[in-house]
């Protein structure tokens, strides 16, 4: 019985090979050797899978499009050796699109091959209308961590991936890019804080979600963490985004529309905390003051002694522990402005009221 089953299985695979060969011969006879089948690719792709040198030679003699076959192979999980075989058949210079496709697919083995053996530049920029840009940016959009690490370790310019990391709301990748030299001020086409706020707020808009992939609460919290990271590293809390205005205006308007939206609230609080100018938004005074109250409560301000010249440090055991651990909130080496008590009290009085001198003073640059 086992012998019979093995024979039947062998016949099945033999038949499959015969079918592929028959398909190739049909394509040759009908002069369609470069037709790209969605599953099998061109006639040359089939021949490579069959490892049939005779058919490969025949196809080459008929001027088969090798580049088309290579491109298909990269996008369809061909092995590195199969792709190397295809490339060995070509005498022309390899186009950047091969590297783009390998990066887009997250094929670290191919990325290494193209860079180390075929001398592609680690900072290659792809001219593609849909997914163009530096290959590090493309890897970041795909969140291919192993490819990102490889590119950075081999000299990729870290700032090339920053905007993609922000659009993806991926704080881990953003931190990695900053470790390799990226900053919040590297001459980007758009302000990073503005890009992030614009991305975060539509992503949490119910109308927006109906026509796109819905975001989870965890995904949205990534935007908040990413904003915090940017502000801690010198991001501009008064950034403007195209026709929408300043980021604090965008965030406050969204919060007024959805008062229970925690993401909008957290964005507003972070921007205010790091110096956003709210003095122009008189119609939002009550909301702004309530946010400042929450900031004070979050920071557990007890009295004036809680503020140091270079940053806020609570006298509570919990905050002290955070400080010792290097919490970014109390890190006095941060590039962002964090207000001292003297700076806060110098501001004009607010309508907050309250029980402490700090609450009675204007809070955070309004």
From Swiss-Prot:
User: Mind listing the UniProt keywords for this protein, alphabetically?
Assistant: ANK repeat, Repeat
ANK repeat boundaries?
39-68, 94-124, 131-160, 162-186, 210-239, 250-280
Which superkingdom, per the lineage?
Answer: Bacteria
Q: Name one Pfam family in it.
A: Ank_2
Is Membrane one of the keywords UniProt gives this record? no
InterPro entries, per the entry: Ankyrin_rpt, Ankyrin_rpt-contain_sf, Cul2-RING_E3_ligase_SR
Q: Which PROSITE patterns match?
A: ANK_REP_REGION
Q: Transmembrane segments in this chain: where? A: none
**What is the protein name given in its UniProt record?**
Putative ankyrin repeat protein RBE_0601
